[in-house]
Protein backbone atom coordinates (compact mmCIF):
# COMPACT_ATOMS: atom_id res chain seq x y z
CA UNK A 1 0.00 0.00 0.00
CA UNK A 2 1.21 3.52 -0.78
CA UNK A 3 0.75 6.26 1.77
CA UNK A 4 0.88 9.85 0.54
CA UNK A 5 2.36 12.43 2.91
CA UNK A 6 2.51 16.19 2.75
CA UNK A 7 6.04 17.20 1.66
CA UNK A 8 6.02 20.19 4.02
CA UNK A 9 4.49 18.84 7.23
CA UNK A 10 4.93 15.08 6.81
CA UNK A 11 1.23 14.61 7.63
CA UNK A 12 -0.40 11.52 6.14
CA UNK A 13 -3.10 12.81 3.79
CA UNK A 14 -4.31 9.90 1.65
CA UNK A 15 -3.40 6.38 0.55
CA UNK A 16 -3.83 4.32 -2.58
CA UNK A 17 -6.70 2.54 -0.83
CA UNK A 18 -8.67 5.44 -2.31
CA UNK A 19 -8.97 5.48 -6.09
CA UNK A 20 -6.72 8.44 -6.97
CA UNK A 21 -7.41 10.07 -10.33
CA UNK A 22 -4.84 12.47 -11.76
CA UNK A 23 -6.43 15.65 -13.13
CA UNK A 24 -4.68 18.19 -15.39
CA UNK A 25 -1.24 16.79 -14.39
CA UNK A 26 -1.45 18.89 -11.20
CA UNK A 27 -3.82 17.28 -8.67
CA UNK A 28 -5.16 13.94 -7.53
CA UNK A 29 -8.85 13.52 -6.83
CA UNK A 30 -10.04 10.85 -4.43
CA UNK A 31 -13.70 9.93 -4.11
CA UNK A 32 -14.76 9.42 -0.53
CA UNK A 33 -18.01 8.84 1.31
CA UNK A 34 -19.90 9.66 4.44
CA UNK A 35 -19.79 6.83 6.99
CA UNK A 36 -21.15 6.32 10.49
CA UNK A 37 -18.56 5.71 13.20
CA UNK A 38 -19.00 4.78 16.81
CA UNK A 39 -17.29 7.06 19.30
CA UNK A 40 -15.13 5.46 21.99
CA UNK A 41 -15.01 1.78 22.77
CA UNK A 42 -17.89 -0.58 23.25
CA UNK A 43 -17.56 -0.88 27.01
CA UNK A 44 -20.19 -2.74 29.03
CA UNK A 45 -19.42 -2.97 32.72
CA UNK A 46 -22.96 -3.75 33.82
CA UNK A 47 -23.73 -7.31 34.93
CA UNK A 48 -27.39 -7.05 34.02
CA UNK A 49 -28.11 -5.68 30.55
CA UNK A 50 -31.83 -5.30 31.30
CA UNK A 51 -30.98 -2.84 34.07
CA UNK A 52 -29.24 -0.49 31.65
CA UNK A 53 -31.09 2.36 30.00
CA UNK A 54 -32.89 1.30 26.84
CA UNK A 55 -31.60 4.47 25.19
CA UNK A 56 -28.07 3.08 25.22
CA UNK A 57 -29.07 0.57 22.57
CA UNK A 58 -29.93 3.39 20.18
CA UNK A 59 -27.41 5.04 17.90
CA UNK A 60 -26.02 7.05 20.79
CA UNK A 61 -22.35 7.82 20.46
CA UNK A 62 -22.27 7.57 16.68
CA UNK A 63 -21.55 10.29 14.19
CA UNK A 64 -21.51 10.58 10.42
CA UNK A 65 -18.11 11.56 9.06
CA UNK A 66 -16.26 11.70 5.79
CA UNK A 67 -14.20 8.49 5.68
CA UNK A 68 -11.07 10.14 4.27
CA UNK A 69 -11.22 13.10 6.68
CA UNK A 70 -11.75 10.69 9.58
CA UNK A 71 -9.09 8.15 8.55
CA UNK A 72 -6.35 10.72 8.09
CA UNK A 73 -7.42 12.98 10.96
CA UNK A 74 -7.88 16.03 8.75
CA UNK A 75 -9.26 19.15 10.40
CA UNK A 76 -11.66 21.59 8.78
CA UNK A 77 -10.41 25.12 8.25
CA UNK A 78 -11.88 28.11 6.48
CA UNK A 79 -10.81 30.72 3.99
CA UNK A 80 -12.31 33.65 2.20
CA UNK A 81 -11.05 34.26 -1.34
CA UNK A 82 -8.49 36.84 -0.25
CA UNK A 83 -6.95 34.68 2.49
CA UNK A 84 -6.91 31.62 0.21
CA UNK A 85 -5.09 33.60 -2.49
CA UNK A 86 -2.52 34.69 0.08
CA UNK A 87 -2.09 31.10 1.30
CA UNK A 88 -1.93 29.49 -2.17
CA UNK A 89 0.72 31.95 -3.41
CA UNK A 90 2.99 31.03 -0.49
CA UNK A 91 2.24 27.32 -0.86
CA UNK A 92 2.95 27.29 -4.60
CA UNK A 93 6.21 29.17 -4.00
CA UNK A 94 7.27 26.52 -1.44
CA UNK A 95 6.38 23.63 -3.76
CA UNK A 96 8.18 25.31 -6.67
CA UNK A 97 11.33 25.69 -4.52
CA UNK A 98 11.19 21.98 -3.62
CA UNK A 99 10.72 21.03 -7.26
CA UNK A 100 13.69 23.17 -8.33
CA UNK A 101 15.85 21.03 -6.04
CA UNK A 102 14.33 17.62 -6.70
CA UNK A 103 12.85 17.76 -10.22
CA UNK A 104 13.81 20.99 -12.09
CA UNK A 105 12.30 19.88 -15.41
CA UNK A 106 8.87 19.66 -13.72
CA UNK A 107 8.88 23.36 -12.66
CA UNK A 108 7.49 24.93 -15.90
CA UNK A 109 4.76 22.28 -16.14
CA UNK A 110 3.90 22.76 -12.46
CA UNK A 111 3.68 26.56 -12.80
CA UNK A 112 1.46 26.43 -15.89
CA UNK A 113 -0.88 23.76 -14.54
CA UNK A 114 -1.05 25.19 -11.02
CA UNK A 115 -2.11 28.62 -12.30
CA UNK A 116 -4.85 27.04 -14.41
CA UNK A 117 -6.11 24.88 -11.57
CA UNK A 118 -6.12 27.71 -9.02
CA UNK A 119 -8.25 29.72 -11.47
CA UNK A 120 -10.76 26.82 -11.51
CA UNK A 121 -10.81 26.79 -7.70
CA UNK A 122 -11.39 30.54 -7.50
CA UNK A 123 -14.16 30.41 -10.12
CA UNK A 124 -16.11 27.97 -7.91
CA UNK A 125 -14.67 29.01 -4.56
CA UNK A 126 -17.96 28.78 -2.64
CA UNK A 127 -18.30 25.08 -3.55
CA UNK A 128 -15.17 24.01 -1.65
CA UNK A 129 -14.53 22.95 1.93
CA UNK A 130 -10.97 23.15 3.24
CA UNK A 131 -9.02 20.72 5.42
CA UNK A 132 -5.55 20.65 6.91
CA UNK A 133 -3.42 17.77 8.13
CA UNK A 134 -3.07 16.51 11.67
CA UNK A 135 -0.14 18.80 12.56
CA UNK A 136 -2.20 21.85 11.54
CA UNK A 137 0.89 23.35 9.90
CA UNK A 138 -0.28 26.62 8.28
CA UNK A 139 2.33 26.29 5.52
CA UNK A 140 1.36 22.73 4.55
CA UNK A 141 -1.15 21.59 1.93
CA UNK A 142 -4.77 22.59 2.33
CA UNK A 143 -6.87 19.71 1.01
CA UNK A 144 -9.99 20.74 -0.90
CA UNK A 145 -13.32 18.94 -0.78
CA UNK A 146 -16.14 19.30 -3.28
CA UNK A 147 -19.04 17.16 -4.51
CA UNK A 148 -19.41 15.37 -7.83
CA UNK A 149 -22.15 16.37 -10.28
CA UNK A 150 -24.63 14.12 -8.45
CA UNK A 151 -24.37 16.46 -5.44
CA UNK A 152 -23.96 13.46 -3.13
CA UNK A 153 -20.49 12.00 -3.72
CA UNK A 154 -17.74 13.98 -1.95
CA UNK A 155 -14.23 14.04 -3.35
CA UNK A 156 -10.96 15.44 -2.05
CA UNK A 157 -8.32 17.26 -4.08
CA UNK A 158 -4.57 16.99 -3.38
CA UNK A 159 -1.81 18.86 -5.21
CA UNK A 160 0.30 15.99 -6.53
CA UNK A 161 3.61 17.86 -6.28
CA UNK A 162 2.86 18.50 -2.61
CA UNK A 163 2.76 14.78 -1.85
CA UNK A 164 5.48 12.22 -1.34
CA UNK A 165 4.60 8.53 -1.49
CA UNK A 166 5.85 5.95 0.96
CA UNK A 167 5.36 2.17 0.87
CA UNK A 168 3.53 0.98 3.93
From Swiss-Prot:
UniProt record similarity statement: Belongs to the TCTP family.
Gene: p23fy
BP GO terms, sorted: cytoplasmic translation
Protein name as catalogued: Translationally-controlled tumor protein homolog
Subcellular location: Cytoplasm
Keyword Disulfide bond: no
Single GO MF descriptor: guanyl nucleotide exchange factor inhibitor activity
Entry GO CC: cytoplasm; cytosol; nucleus
List of residues that carry Phosphoserine: 78
Keyword terms of this UniProt record: Calcium, Chaperone, Cytoplasm, Phosphoprotein
PANTHER family linked to this entry: TRANSLATIONALLY CONTROLLED TUMOR PROTEIN-RELATED (PTHR11991), TRANSLATIONALLY-CONTROLLED TUMOR PROTEIN (PTHR11991:SF0)
Function: Involved in calcium binding and microtubule stabilization. May be a guanine nucleotide-free chaperone (GFC).
UniProt cross-references to PROSITE patterns, sorted A to Z: TCTP_1, TCTP_2, TCTP_3
InterPro entries noted in UniProt: Mss4-like_sf, Mss4/transl-control_tumour, TCTP, Translation_control_tumour_CS, Translational_control_tumour_p
Coiled coil: none
Domain TCTP as annotated: residue spans: 1-168
